[in-house]
């Protein structure tokens, strides 16, 4: 009995051991399977996170682009609206065009004392004020010939006025729009002319610089006439030449036409960078480029100029001028196109009023870079003036 029992016990032990072994293997397999699934979940999560981040980044970028495009569209619509509104605004308010032509509110250089021309290197210049009309006062500079600069030190206005009766010729300079009589390029021209032995008298029109009054073509012309008469009353038989630059050429031809009509013409007229008339100049000006082909350009932009009483008709005035005429123009002038100066010459040269006087056109090559206001730099300018102002016989040349 003991022998039979022992095998049975051993068999049970083997079965238990086998069962235990089987159970451990299953547990191990189950544990391995759990770890594998966990690893797979972790791996899947790690791959999904970059994809989600990329999607979010793309959405943000698209949002920024959309916002930028909306802002850009808004800006474009505003610019377009302004572009369309400006012509109507100018048509309804012609005074805007007048301000853009005169630009008297632009005072360059800033922070200079016009009462002290010596601060601009003009140490032989006197500042004083004249009154062309009631409630109108204009500031004037009188620069004597450079050879007198030592004698001029400390002298008063009376000395300068008496000096006009000396044997030196006088140039009345009429500046263009914007700035004052103290503008840098203007001061440099005064110095050149003074070094050549001329008196230079210049002034700011009413509404410019420290001059009092409201700008207008009539007012500017009257101011110039008043200064001319003031000079003639003190200069005796000395030659008086009138020099106009840019917009000042319009004032100059207005003045000289009036002087010729009253039979008191100047000894010569010099026009630097002139135009034919203000309508053609406005149409050719760089500011008009963006509107030049705008429907109704003349009606919107040019007619308001005329309705404001602004013409500056050089092309008409030269037909009534009887004195020598010199025209100076740089080929690279970006403000008053060179062809307008040449066109003015072609109108003046055959005019009957000039049949007894010389008319000369002097171009300056674009390579020289004199542009609109630097002709004073030309080393040829002294010779040109000396030869032109020294001649008296009728002559047309260019």
UniProtKB/Swiss-Prot annotation:
GO molecular function, one term: phospholipase activity
Source species of the chain: Macaca fascicularis
Record PANTHER family: ALPHA/BETA HYDROLASE DOMAIN-CONTAINING PROTEIN (PTHR12277), LYSOPHOSPHATIDYLSERINE LIPASE ABHD12 (PTHR12277:SF61)
The protein's name in its UniProt record: Lysophosphatidylserine lipase ABHD12
One CC-aspect GO term: endoplasmic reticulum membrane
Keyword Glycoprotein on entry: yes
Protein family (similarity comment): Belongs to the serine esterase family.
Membrane topology qualifier: Single-pass membrane protein
UniProt signal peptide: none
A biological process from GO: phosphatidylserine catabolic process
Residues in the Cytoplasmic compartment per record: 1-74
Disulfide bonds: none
Active site: 246 (nucleophile), 333 (charge relay system), 372 (charge relay system)
């Amino acid at each position: 009995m003991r022998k039979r029992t022992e095998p049975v016990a051993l068999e049970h032990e083997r079965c238990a051991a086998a069962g235990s072994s089987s159970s451990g293997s299953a547990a191990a397999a189950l544990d391995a399977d759990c770890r594998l699934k966990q690893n797979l979940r972790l791996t899947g999560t790690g791959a999904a996170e970059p994809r989600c981040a990329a999607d979010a980044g793309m959405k943000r970028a698209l949002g920024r682009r959309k916002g930028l495009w909306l802002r850009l569209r808004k800006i474009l619509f505003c610019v377009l609206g302004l572009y369309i509104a400006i012509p109507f605004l100018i048509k309804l308010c012609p005074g805007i065009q007048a301000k853009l032509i005169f630009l008297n509110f632009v005072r360059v250089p800033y922070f200079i004392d016009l009462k002290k021309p010596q601060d601009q290197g003009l140490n032989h210049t006197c500042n004083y004020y004249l009154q062309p009309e009631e409630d109108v006062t204009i500031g004037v500079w009188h620069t004597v010939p450079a050879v007198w600069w030592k004698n001029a030190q400390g002298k008063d206005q009376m000395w300068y006025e008496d000096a006009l009766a000396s044997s030196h010729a006088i140039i009345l300079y009429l500046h263009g729009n914007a700035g004052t009589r103290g503008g840098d390029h203007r001061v440099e021209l005064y110095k050149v002319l003074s070094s050549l032995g001329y008196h230079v008298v210049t002034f700011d029109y009413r509404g410019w610089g420290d001059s009092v009054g409201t700008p207008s073509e009539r007012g500017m012309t009257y101011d110039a006439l008043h200064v001319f008469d003031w000079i003639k009353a003190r200069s005796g038989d000395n030659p008086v030449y009138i020099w106009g630059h840019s917009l000042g050429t319009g004032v100059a031809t207005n003045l000289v036409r009036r002087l010729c009509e009253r039979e008191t013409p100047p000894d010569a007229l010099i026009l630097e960078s002139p135009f034919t008339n203000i309508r053609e100049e406005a149409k050719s000006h760089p500011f008009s480029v963006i509107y030049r082909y705008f429907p109704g350009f003349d009606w919107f932009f040019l007619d308001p100029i005329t309705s404001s009483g602004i013409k500056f008709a050089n092309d008409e005035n030269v037909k009534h001028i009887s004195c020598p005429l010199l025209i100076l123009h740089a080929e690279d002038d970006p403000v008053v196109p060179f062809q307008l100066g040449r066109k003015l010459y072609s109108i003046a040269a055959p005019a009957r009023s000039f049949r007894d006087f010389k008319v000369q056109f002097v171009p300056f090559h674009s390579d020289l870079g004199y542009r609109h206001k630097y002709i004073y730099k030309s080393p040829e300018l002294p010779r040109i003036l000396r030869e032109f102002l020294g001649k008296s016989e009728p002559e047309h040349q260019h």
